[in-house]
Amino acid sequence: MINISKLYCDEVTPGDWLRYGKKDSGDPSGQIVPKKASDRRPVVVWNITRACNLKCIHCYNDSGSDKSSNDITTQKAKAVLDDLADFGVPSVLFSGGEPLMRPDLFDLAQYANKSGLRTVISTNGTLITADKAARIKDCGISYVGISLDGIGKINDNFRGVDGAFEKAVQGIKNCIHVGVRVGLRLTLTRRNVQDLEGLFDFFEAQAIERACFYHLVPSGRGSTITSEDLTHSQRRAAIETILAKTRHFKETGKKTDILTVGNHVDGVYLYLKLLKENPARAKKVWKLLT
């Protein structure tokens, strides 16, 4: 995970406290982050189910509506959460599949929070009604990452279900309305790379605080669409757009945390770019990367 906002623009972002902040630090929001790497325990991403209401063509988990038979039981899931709390894990991200397909998700999130674990969910957003958003807030989930892969039909074609984009947008609005932090997760492919400008416009219009751009992972159903992966020139152009837009957000005072995921070379590219633009900053970035 490469934090573009932090590295390229020296921007203070909420990403670190979302991952490493400690609830027992005296700050009720857990926004104090240990400075020593040795004090930062690993964040756990837990695919809590393989059930999903969508049919995303690039799903790394090959999830589907009929794939919940082997899901862990509530009792065993709570035992896992006990172990994570004992280990000192700062945050658990419930993913899937679609975590909101689990009837006990809110029970598990509440249990985790009472055990001292910050809870986050990764969702497609289409199931977040006003009532679900309120329950997300009430059970203590601190952040909701919603997956989108383009605007309108571009997203729906990825997701395999018409209307998925509009439902996800409503889910975003429902979360913001009740005061839950929201970010977006996007997988870059040849189908949506030309839509990057529109996506950044969408971030601004929806007041999105965090956006993660994922490189295509060739596993699950994603292994069947490797031809959709970006070419070298497309990837470079995409990173240049992301860097330019992140700089624009910084210069206009917009607090949006921009990251890329799944290709550590992005960090090297950013460093080499800074080496030409701002050698002093490049030196600091080198230390952060290494």
Regions found by a protein language model. Name each.
Residues D62-S65, G150-G152, V217, H264:
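Short, histidine-centered active-site or binding-site loop motifs used for metal coordination
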Residues I2-Y143:
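Conserved alpha-helical substructure of the radical SAM core
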